[in-house]
Amino acid sequence: MASEGLAGALASVLAGQGSSVHSCDSAPAGEPPAPVRLRKNVCYVVLAVFLSEQDEVLLIQEAKRECRGSWYLPAGRMEPGETIVEALQREVKEEAGLHCEPETLLSVEERGPSWVRFVFLARPTGGILKTSKEADAESLQAAWYPRTSLPTPLRAHDILHLVELAAQYRQQARHPLILPQELPCDLVCQRLVATFTSAQTVWVLVGTVGMPHLPVTACGLDPMEQRGGMKMAVLRLLQECLTLHHLVVEIKGLLGLQHLGRDHSDGICLNVLVTVAFRSPGIQDEPPKVRGENFSWWKVMEEDLQSQLLQRLQGSSVVPVNR
């Protein structure tokens, strides 16, 4: 029964769906983490990349005093009570005049758990492109430009990589379409699909307190975890059950994203694909030994799940997380 429950949970995460977070298997030392609040201790930013069939990019001209007249992708901070998609649609409407639908999450960027930006590939579904006659405090205007000939000045050059990422995804999608799942969460946390592979066999680390489950680690907002980024919470959990000095841990990227934003629930859960391997060369048929009784390795026997995991691992078929 436990194996069936784990298989269902893993299948859900691999499909980009996820599940509710009820507790965490690892948390920063000291006080238990308090619920996060937008505008108080966390900031989420949404950004949209639009690519037309003519290979044009939608840009907006900034109205803010510090960058007035420069060009950027439609972007802005989420407001309390919004879902991620609602925030994206509001920002695009305010800055570009268009209605839109997100196609997929393209990238997640973080400066520690308290500042996270969600980058989407999106498509317009209506509205009227904002012109200079409608200039306001949100933007001066919006316009389409050839991807290879963007206007100057740009507000920042970080968007160039994002535009190319969108173009690459359109040409050859590296991961399935992934959209935020509307599931509430109080904390910034990560659910780990931590894998060890040997030949064509895959093991997944599971939490064993209560019903066996994919482990969840809470991100701390203290200065050390802020400086180290969100990988710190992943390494903390693994350090609690594995001897890391003879292992190589790689965070491959995201399988999914969970957030709701209503009823004062401002947390997010990132479902993260992680690999664990031995540092020394040689064939290791068994995963590294687990310390303590709170975690164990689960050998994935279901052929479909095993092949999905191997495909996602070998093709790096995940949403990238960047610092």
From Swiss-Prot:
Cofactor: Mn(2+); Mg(2+)
EC number: 3.6.1.58
Any single biological process term in GO: dADP catabolic process
Cited InterPro entries: Nudix_hydrolase, NUDIX_hydrolase-like_dom_sf, NUDIX_hydrolase_CS, NUDIX_hydrolase_dom, NUDT18_NUDIX
Catalyzed chemical reaction(s): 8-oxo-dGDP + H2O = 8-oxo-dGMP + phosphate + H(+); 8-oxo-dADP + H2O = 8-oxo-dAMP + phosphate + H(+); 2-oxo-dADP + H2O = 2-oxo-dAMP + phosphate + H(+); 8-oxo-GDP + H2O = 8-oxo-GMP + phosphate + H(+)
Role according to the record: Mediates the hydrolysis of oxidized nucleoside diphosphate derivatives. Hydrolyzes 8-oxo-7,8-dihydroguanine (8-oxo-Gua)-containing deoxyribo- and ribonucleoside diphosphates to the monophosphates. Hydrolyzes 8-oxo-dGDP and 8-oxo-GDP with the same efficiencies. Also hydrolyzes 8-OH-dADP and 2-OH-dADP. Exhibited no or minimal hydrolysis activity against 8-oxo-dGTP, 8-oxo-GTP, dGTP, GTP, dGDP and GDP. Probably removes oxidized guanine nucleotides from both the DNA and RNA precursor pools.
Record protein name field: 8-oxo-dGDP phosphatase NUDT18
Organism whose genome encodes this protein: Homo sapiens (Human)
Gene that produces this protein: NUDT18
